[in-house]
C-alpha cells in the first residue's frame, strides 16, 4: 500500500476531563454553608391542568361579588337613574353572566384547537360569536 502525506488537522475541541471529586464535594457542602435552595417549579402546563380540574369540579362563582355588582349598577345607570337591585337579582345576573362566559370560552377553545393551536386568541372569540350568531 502506497504511503500518503498526512496533513495537520485542527482539534475539534472535545470535552476536557472533569474533576469528579471536587464537584461532588462542593455540591455536598453547598447547603451546609448556607446555599439558597431553589424553589420547586412544576413543568409548564402542570399547574394549568390542575387548575382546570379544580374549577371544573367546583360550582362557586369566579367573579367577585362586589366588583360585579358595581359593574351592573354602572351599566344600569345608562338606562335609568336611581335603580335599586335585590341581592337575588344581582346574584342571578352574575350566575347567567358566568355561565355565558364559560360557554363562550369552551367554544373559543374549540376554535383554537380547530386551527391546530392550544392558545386562544381574540380571533377565536370573534369566530365563536360569529358562528353562534351573536355578532355579524
Curated annotation (Swiss-Prot):
Its main location: nucleus. The modification Phosphoserine is found at residues 11, 29. Gene3D superfamilies: Histone, subunit A (1.10.20.10). The modification N6-methyllysine is found at residues 5, 10, 19, 24, 28, 37. Pfam families: Histone. Coiled coil: none annotated. Expressed in inflorescences, buds and seedlings. The record marks 28, 37 as: Not N6-acetylated. InterPro entries: Histone-fold, Histone_H2A/H2B/H3, Histone_H3/CENP-A. The record marks 15 as: Not N6-methylated. The modification N6,N6,N6-trimethyllysine is found at residues 5, 10, 28, 37. The modification N6-acetyllysine is found at residues 10, 15, 19, 24. The record marks 32 as: Required for interaction with TSK. Belongs to the histone H3 family. The nucleosome is a histone octamer containing two molecules each of H2A, H2B, H3 and H4 assembled in one H3-H4 heterotetramer and two H2A-H2B heterodimers. The octamer wraps approximately 147 bp of DNA. The H3K9meK27me dimethylated N-terminal tail of histone H3 can directly interact with the chromodomains of CMT3 and/or LHP1. Interacts with ORTH2. Interacts (in absence of H3K27me) with TSK. Core component of nucleosome. Nucleosomes wrap and compact DNA into chromatin, limiting DNA accessibility to the cellular machineries which require DNA as a template. Histones thereby play a central role in transcription regulation, DNA repair, DNA replication and chromosomal stability. DNA accessibility is regulated via a complex set of post-translational modifications of histones, also called histone code, and nucleosome remodeling. PANTHER family: HISTONE H3. This is Histone H3.1. The lineage of its organism: Eukaryota, Viridiplantae, Streptophyta, Embryophyta, Tracheophyta. The gene is HTR2.
Amino acid at each position: 500500500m502506497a504511503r500518503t502525506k498526512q496533513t495537520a488537522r485542527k482539534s475539534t475541541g472535545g470535552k476536557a476531563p472533569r474533576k469528579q471529586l471536587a464537584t461532588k464535594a462542593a455540591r455536598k457542602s453547598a447547603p451546609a454553608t448556607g446555599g439558597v435552595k431553589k424553589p420547586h417549579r412544576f413543568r409548564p402546563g402542570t399547574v394549568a391542568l390542575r387548575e382546570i380540574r379544580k374549577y371544573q369540579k367546583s360550582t362557586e362563582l369566579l367573579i367577585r361579588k362586589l366588583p360585579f355588582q358595581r359593574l351592573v349598577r354602572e351599566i344600569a345607570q345608562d338606562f335609568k337613574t336611581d335603580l335599586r337591585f335585590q341581592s337575588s337579582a344581582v346574584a342571578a345576573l352574575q350566575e347567567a353572566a358566568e355561565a355565558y362566559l364559560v360557554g363562550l370560552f369552551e367554544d373559543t377553545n374549540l376554535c383554537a384547537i380547530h386551527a391546530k393551536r392550544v392558545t386562544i386568541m381574540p380571533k377565536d372569540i370573534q369566530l365563536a360569536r360569529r358562528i353562534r350568531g351573536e355578532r355579524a
